[in-house]
Amino acid sequence: WKTGDVLLLNGKIYTGRDAAHKRMVDMLNKGEKLPVDFTDKIIYYVGPVDPVRDEVVGPAGPTTATRMDKFTRQMLEQTGLLGMIGKSERGEAACQAIADNKAVYLMAVGGSAYLVAKAIKEAKVVAFPELGMEAIYEFEVKDMPVTVAVDSSGLSVHAVAPKQWQAKIGIKILDRKSVV
């Protein structure tokens, strides 16, 4: 996968936000076994809302990935994690950790929590239920739309896309003072 590629994910992914990451890193630091095997898996930075009626989960939009940057290298190196899904750009250290571990960071579209939830076909809590919506869930997804935001070489769409878009549409980015 290359930066900017649009993918439809299918299969099992796990969830985890700030509280779950903190707990997992604390466990790793103590030499404890994690309750989930993340080898070659993807973790989605999300805290799903409770389902209503026939929903599997309620709205399940991505959370800001930069909050997990401080956990990224350790999670990749000690768990065998393949990749992460979130929204927003990643910091330089996280991009380097992704490159060093030949991992990937995918972006789900922020603001589309309801649409993302429709791709989730099954959901169950697999660890840390006391964390509520920040518990670790296992999702079975079908055709979950994501964009490769940082590829396995560490190249970030946030670094390259603005220049590519400018070249394609042939305009310069204007400030408010120059807009007529």
Where would I find each of the regions flagged by the language model?
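Pocket-edge structural micro-motifs
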Residues: 11, 46-48, 150
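C-terminal binding/interaction regions
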Residues: 118-176
